[in-house]
């Protein structure tokens, strides 16, 4: 501690941490039959070589609970479901690769209490969204596809089966890091770039999601804000365009894009 309140001199503090060769804690799913007052046997051997294993909750009807297993080395990631009836474990997702799974920004969304689930994967070489059959664990369809990157899912409209997300890299000749706000039906149809203007976009929706504000900019374009209608993505009104003329009058120059 460099500047303790109790004295002028630093205080040496010790921190105990695991080092190569040390025994590491292992977290495993456990199931108890409350009425019979006994622990049910689970086959947990496949999940012992772990970076982490997290329990992720029970199904609404209590038929099962789920967990996520990240194998040490980050080349396998499993979403498992444990049956409350007999303790059997089945894999809803078993993501495997020879390279690396970017586990930090994984995305999973359970539909209809696990009958389907949305899962982001890079299995085709690009980060895209997949619809998984929650009964069989098989891929029902690849929802998004192409030589571009799905950055983040923002909202899933379960009633209309539409997903809203940010993506980048699909507009040729544009900065591949520009974020665009998009939507697509869960059957893979109806892809719409809701913010087609050349720039990096940030959107904010109204409470009922009928309208949204879109603020976009580039290094060589001061921020522009618009009000848009969600249904047809039409521009309802231009709200503001940043004026940098005073800066330019003082000799400031916009960055040169290259």
Please provide the spans of the model-predicted regions.
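Blade/loop signatures of beta-propeller domains
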Residues: 17, 25-34
């Amino acid at each position: 501690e460099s500047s303790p309140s109790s004295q002028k001199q630093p205080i040496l503090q010790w921190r105990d941490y695991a080092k190569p060769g040390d025994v590491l804690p292992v977290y495993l799913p456990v199931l108890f039959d409350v009425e019979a007052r006994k622990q049910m046997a689970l086959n947990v051997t496949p999940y012992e070589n772990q970076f982490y294993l997290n329990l992720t909750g029970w199904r609404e009807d209590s038929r099962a609970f789920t967990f996520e297993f990240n194998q040490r080395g980050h080349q396998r990631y499993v979403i498992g479901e444990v049956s409350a009836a007999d303790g059997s474990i089945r894999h809803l997702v078993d993501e495997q690769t020879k390279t690396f799974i970017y586990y930090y920004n994984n995305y999973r969304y359970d539909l209809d209490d696990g009958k389907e689930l949305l899962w982001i994967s890079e299995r085709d070489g690009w980060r895209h969204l997949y619809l998984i059959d929650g009964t069989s664990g098989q891929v029902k369809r690849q929802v998004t596809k192409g030589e571009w990157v799905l950055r983040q899912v923002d909202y899933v409209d379960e009633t209309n089966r539409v997903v809203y997300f940010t993506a980048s890299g699909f507009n040729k000749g544009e900065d591949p890091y520009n974020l665009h706000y998009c939507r697509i039906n869960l059957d893979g149809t109806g892809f719409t770039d809701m913010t087609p203007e050349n720039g990096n976009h940030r959107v904010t929706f109204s409470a009922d999601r009928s309208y949204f504000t879109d603020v976009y900019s580039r290094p060589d374009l001061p921020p522009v804000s618009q009000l848009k209608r969600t249904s047809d993505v039409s521009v309802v009104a231009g709200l503001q365009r940043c004026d940098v003329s005073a800066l330019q009058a003082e000799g400031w120059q916009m960055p040169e894009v290259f």
